[in-house]
């Protein structure tokens, strides 16, 4: 459980770094190019020696984003619960996608982890305000113990043509 919280915490700081640097992605993310694709890590991920990348753009055009929770620019969980957290996540997702000149229409799959499945309707109302049909494929699960006590975590896969 501690490793999962550390991984998600790193993603929080990655999101804070990305959201402030949409116009100059190379200034905030470290990129490693390999034959299979480009791997992006935040400064925090590198400092903490986390065993994962924050975002990967494969040579085949797939873009994998590590899970996002509803944090602000300082990496702290936004107050107010599911609604504000969800909007913060979509702001982060937009910034992540912008790093590769992508948008919500380029997302093909989402994994939603929610702390209370009874809030599913509330989440869906916000989700559908960001995505338009045809919607990405999606999986969901109830999850207890998300980093920082978050109500939601969202992980996405996009395609860059």
Show the residue positions of the predicted features.
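Sec-dependent signal peptide recognition
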Residues: 2-10
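Surface-exposed aromatic
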Residues: 108-110
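N-terminal presequence-like segments and the immediate start of the first folded domain
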Residues: 13-91, 95-105, 114-161
């Amino acid at each position: 459980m501690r490793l999962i919280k550390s991984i998600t915490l790193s993603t929080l700081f990655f999101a804070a770094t990305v959201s402030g640097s949409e116009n100059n992605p190379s200034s905030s993310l470290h990129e490693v190019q390999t034959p299979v694709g480009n791997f992006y890590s935040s400064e925090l991920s590198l400092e903490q020696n986390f065993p994962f990348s924050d975002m990967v753009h494969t040579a085949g055009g797939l873009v994998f984003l590590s899970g996002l929770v509803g944090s602000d620019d300082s990496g702290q969980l936004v107050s107010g619960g599911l609604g504000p957290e969800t909007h913060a996540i979509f702001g982060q997702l937009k910034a992540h996608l912008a790093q590769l000149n992508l948008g919500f229409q380029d997302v093909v799959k989402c994994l939603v982890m929610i702390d209370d499945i009874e809030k599913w309707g509330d989440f869906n109302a916000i989700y559908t305000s960001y995505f338009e049909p045809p919607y990405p494929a999606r999986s969901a699960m109830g999850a207890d113990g998300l980093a920082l006590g978050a109500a939601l975590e969202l992980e996405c896969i996009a395609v860059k043509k």
